[in-house]
Amino acid sequence: MLVDTGLGLISELQAKLGWAVLLQIVPITIVAYNLLWFIYASFFSSLRKIPGPFLARISRVWEMKKTATGNIHEIMMDLHRRHGAIVRIGPRRYDFDTMEALKIIYRIGNALPKADYYKPFGLPSFPNLFDEQNPARHSAIKKQVASLYTMTALLSYEEGVDGQTAILKEQLQRFCDQKQVIDLPRFLQYYAFDVIGVITVGKSMGMMESNSDTNGACSALDGMWHYASMMAYIPNMHAWWLRLSSLLPIEVPIKGLTEYVERRIIQYRLKAAEFGDDAALKGENNFLAKLLLMEKKGTVTPVETQQAVGLNIGAGSDTTANALSTILYYLYTNPRTLHTLREELERYVKDGPISFQQSQSMPYLQAVIKEALRLHPGVGTQLTRVVPKGGLVIEGQFFPEGTEVGVNGWALYHNKAIFGNDASIFRPERWLEANENINIGGSFAFGAGSRSCIGKNISILEMSKAIPQIVRNFDIEINHGDMTWKNECWWFVKPEYKAMIKPRRCCLSRDESLV
């Protein structure tokens, strides 16, 4: 509707003024608007004293330009180190790094709506669980699929996760035998895709066994995150771009993954039709089968089924892969921590898969996971919300209705006022001696409040399965060769490094193992 209205307005102006005049008026209008806004923001706004980059006062170009570097998470941490708890990052956009701000902005009751920033993460006509801005509509969508994410449902997927974790171990052993240097974060993404494939559509994507990006899923997601991260700063252009891409031979990044999801849905529909009843679906334990049964009851539509399946595969794979890559990096570059974790694992389970329930009773394993996610939270940008009618007071400053506010996880988790002077150090023990603030902040790696990641327990299930199997069986030489640890942020902050898998040195003394 917005696209059609915009096109109609342009056509009307062009007919009255002609293209030559129109092309002169548009840039003049843009410059005049930004100049007037700068004057207001600098001299009259109640928020004029909040520090931040000069260009951020008048335009989102500053934030867009910094995002394009792939390093926005580091830039945000530096801004807070220099300016304190509140920084300006755009016209009417402010970022925070405190627990007080987190509790207010991501409150559960009377939740703040998401900003237009999220529009490019979905389709304009069919908002999904992630990009839906209205809290009430989001709640309705969430209610439709909540039963798929309960603890009972989670435990029912455990056997499928065990099967893929066994393949992970086999493939790592093959790399070990071949003394092969691998892109470990990429291979862990293959694992995450294969697991989420089994859980979501009842079938592995076969990435680990082929050691390849089947269906182009990994590259498709990379392209989508790049696109959405930049388009988020001009969100109203998203619908225009989708319309243009449908008219021109423009490659849509997510096409391969979308086609894979569509094929699996068609296969399941045909399977159900062949049997003529629900027996074929009831015998399957995965998201898609359950969604198709919900379709038959009228609780979800075919479009909602496709959205839920696509979102589960897309968001679930990157979240888990990045977390696993980070955990292993910090474990294998901190021998003392690795040794302590191995001692705990040996006390609980001598061999075979570790159950999810067993993993939850291992305090040091859970502390390792939390600490890695603290130092390297998955999302590197602000989780933006809009101040509601009546305004809000945050950190002693009043913010009027319509202001965009949010907390950057990287800035929060590296804040020494919260996590101490060793905030930049990997020290899992902090979670075993944690205070209330740290415990509350600990969950922010998966968002907070009513909009926290609905699939976070699936990700934790995968981590709790994969990490013990790897740690008990292998040593890993990180940064083998000349490729060092890098992090690039396009919404998600993706770790990049090479590694060599080696047999675990089981017979070393404690002192030798700490070298």
From Swiss-Prot:
One GO MF term attached to the UniProt entry: iron ion binding
PROSITE patterns named among the record's database cross-references: CYTOCHROME_P450
Coiled coil start-end: none
Cofactor: heme
Top-rank lineage group of the source organism: Eukaryota
Keywords: Heme, Iron, Metal-binding, Monooxygenase, Oxidoreductase
KW Calcium (keyword) present: no
EC number of this enzyme: 1.14.-.-
SUPFAM superfamilies, alphabetized: Cytochrome P450
Residues annotated as binding heme: 453
InterPro entries, per database record: Cyt_P450, Cyt_P450_CS, Cyt_P450_E_grp-I, Cyt_P450_sf, Cytochrome_P450_monoxygenase
Reported function: Can detoxify the phytoalexin pisatin from garden pea. Pisatin is an antimicrobial compound produced by pea in response to infection by plant pathogens.
Family: Belongs to the cytochrome P450 family.
PANTHER family linked: CYTOCHROME P450, P450, PUTATIVE (EUROFUNG)-RELATED
Protein name as it appears in the record: Pisatin demethylase
Organism expressing this protein natively: Fusarium vanettenii
Gene: PDAT9
